[in-house]
Amino acid sequence: MAQLIDGKKLAEDVVSTVKTETEKLVAATGIVPGIAVVIVGEDPASQVYVASKSKKAKECGFHSVQHDLPETASEQELLDLIESLNNDPAIHGILVQLPLPKHIDSGRVIQTISPDKDVDGFHFINVGKLGTGEVETAFVPCTPAGAMIMIERIHGRDLSGLNAVVIGRSNIVGKPMFNLLLAANATVTVAHSRTKDLPAIARTADILVAAVGRPQMVKGDWVKPGATVIDVGINRIPAPERGEGRTRLVGDVDFVEAEKVAGAITPVPGGVGPMTIAMLMANTLTAACRTAGVKKPVF
């Protein structure tokens, strides 16, 4: 039976470090990490995500502000707000909650955020830094950053000699995951929906990362015995056994089968998910440390 990688516990550890290092930063420099969260419209899921991020920021001792714009807000209004936040010295991290209404160009909005305050890690400059191995000076997207901490807890920071397979090529998870694994000296293969003989490729992995958004796509016989399996997927599927109309969350991996084969595995829920918000807090603290000219903490 595989070792369970407890994302909730790891996330608590990261947040605990953020709290401690924030107190040290404030005591030494007087700088309080500041994060601004911007939401456009009233999408219920987005409201829940934003509330949890704001709550966690306050728990960490951050200066946290939330800007709520109506669904009808123009793109220019949003861009003007971002520019004002770019110029606000009390704000070190800016997060625009996605998705945005259809009349707003998300790409343009993201590229308007100052790269130094882009704690989501989506600006072209941060993407480029990560792609050229400048991991220390980049902001890394929060989900793959959290997944890497999970991998490091099992294998250490140097992945030399290990084969990693990332299933999924999204800009948010798949591509940055590839770059992080490569920077840690793993031999990395990126696979996707058009990859030939995907199960055979997955079976070569000492570290298998699933990030495709397909419920339970990765079967137990895709997993190399003893491999570390990181399941990034969060999918809601019908659960008639719980009653009519009920649902449950599953990952991209068939957990029940994969757990029998893997050496270590993340559950869904309670795996990578909690790490995402924790790493957002870590990135915000890092931004404040860079502003203060002090060394950023290691997570």
Curated annotation (Swiss-Prot):
Catalyzed reaction equations: (6R)-5,10-methylene-5,6,7,8-tetrahydrofolate + NADP(+) = (6R)-5,10-methenyltetrahydrofolate + NADPH; (6R)-5,10-methenyltetrahydrofolate + H2O = (6R)-10-formyltetrahydrofolate + H(+)
PROSITE patterns: THF_DHG_CYH_1 (PS00766), THF_DHG_CYH_2 (PS00767)
UniProt keyword Heme present: no
GO biological process terms on file: L-histidine biosynthetic process; methionine biosynthetic process; purine nucleotide biosynthetic process; tetrahydrofolate interconversion
Superkingdom, natural source: Bacteria
GO-annotated molecular function: methenyltetrahydrofolate cyclohydrolase activity; methylenetetrahydrofolate dehydrogenase (NADP+) activity
EC number: 1.5.1.5, 3.5.4.9
Associated pathway: One-carbon metabolism; tetrahydrofolate interconversion
InterPro entries: Aminoacid_DH-like_N_sf (IPR046346), NAD(P)-bd_dom_sf (IPR036291), THF_DH/CycHdrlase (IPR000672), THF_DH/CycHdrlase_cat_dom (IPR020630), THF_DH/CycHdrlase_CS (IPR020867), THF_DH/CycHdrlase_NAD-bd_dom (IPR020631)
Keywords: Amino-acid biosynthesis, Histidine biosynthesis, Hydrolase, Methionine biosynthesis, Multifunctional enzyme, NADP, One-carbon metabolism, Oxidoreductase, Purine biosynthesis
Entry GO CC: cytosol
Positions that bind NADP(+): G168, R169, S170, S193, I234
Quaternary structure note: Homodimer.
Family membership noted in the UniProt record: Belongs to the tetrahydrofolate dehydrogenase/cyclohydrolase family.
Role according to the record: Catalyzes the oxidation of 5,10-methylenetetrahydrofolate to 5,10-methenyltetrahydrofolate and then the hydrolysis of 5,10-methenyltetrahydrofolate to 10-formyltetrahydrofolate.
Protein name (database record): Bifunctional protein FolD
Gene this chain is encoded by: folD
